């Protein structure tokens, strides 16, 4: 039986990662994965969630105490972005703290090798009529203290996650699936992603101006048109 914790180390052995920055959600809290990333020459950006109570508490405390003036971090950077989309305004503020003393105090260097940055991303969303929504997320990283670059990495991670899930739901109605027993949910998830990859590949090579929905329907009626990408 496999999950992210067991699958990620096997995947890392097959990928050339030197010089890359890997962003992984909370599953990567396992130290073996982080150590494998550093051994492969890759940097990491890892989400810190409440299911990691000690680390979450220490990272949050570092930002709270820095704001109160309890200490002055050796390195600090901040950036802010404001976006308007469909009548909704979203403001993101990324604050990054660093310094070897601070990082060693927050997290054991043996557990989180080469930790260099503590990251806080505060988001505020205001809709045209809805209530104001606020969220705060924390991350740790081996990357240098650079708020703009780290915010781009964090947003890139969630862009991939949200984009994939939205496409699977809209085009393949994943959220409406009522299979919950045995291996059926996992099998259907694999089939949906395989189908999505085939449609995307066909779209990129032969029909870049045709929407995903139209291509999906056409392939459903004429599956043989996929032959060039399956050969």
Please provide the spans of the model-predicted regions:
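Short amphipathic alpha-helical "interface-anchor" segments enriched in bulky aromatics
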Residues: 140, 144-178
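An anionic, glycine-rich sequence signature occurring as long contiguous blocks
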Residues: 49-156
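Short, conserved catalytic/metal-binding motifs centered on acidic residues
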Residues: 8, 21-29, 44, 139, ...
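A short, flexible helix-boundary coil/loop motif
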Residues: 72, 167-231
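A short alpha/beta connector and helix-capping loop motif
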Residues: 31-49
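Generic secondary-structure signature for well-ordered alpha-helical cores
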Residues: 13, 42, 64, 68, ...
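Solvent-exposed alpha-helices and their adjacent loops that cap or buttress functional pockets
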Residues: 13-16, 36-39, 111, 128-132
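Conserved, well-structured functional cores that handle cations and Mg-NTP chemistry
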Residues: 1-24, 29-32, 205, 209, ...
């Amino acid at each position: 039986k496999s999950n992210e914790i067991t699958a990620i180390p096997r995947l890392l052995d097959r990928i050339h990662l030197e010089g890359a920055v890997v962003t992984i959600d909370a599953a990567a809290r396992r130290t073996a994965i982080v150590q494998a990333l550093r051994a492969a020459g890759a940097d990491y950006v890892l989400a810190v969630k409440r299911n990691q109570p000690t680390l979450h508490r220490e990272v949050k405390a570092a930002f709270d105490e820095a704001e109160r003036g309890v200490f002055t971090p050796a390195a600090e950077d901040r950036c802010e972005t404001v976006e308007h989309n469909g009548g909704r305004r979203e403001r993101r503020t990324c604050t990054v703290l660093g310094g070897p003393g601070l990082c060693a105090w927050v997290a054991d260097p043996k557990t989180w090798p080469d930790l260099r940055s503590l990251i806080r991303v505060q988001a505020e969303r205001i809709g045209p009529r809805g209530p104001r929504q606020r969220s705060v997320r924390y991350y740790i990283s081996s990357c240098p203290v650079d708020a703009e670059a780290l915010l781009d990495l964090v947003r890139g991670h969630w862009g991939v996650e949200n984009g994939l899930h939205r496409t699977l739901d809209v085009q393949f109605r994943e959220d409406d699936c009522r299979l919950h027993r045995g291996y059926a949910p996992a099998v259907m998830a694999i089939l949906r992603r395989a189908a999505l990859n085939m449609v995307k590949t066909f779209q990129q090579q032969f029909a870049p101006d045709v929407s995903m929905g139209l291509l999906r329907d056409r392939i459903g009626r004429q599956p043989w048109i996929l032959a060039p990408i399956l050969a």
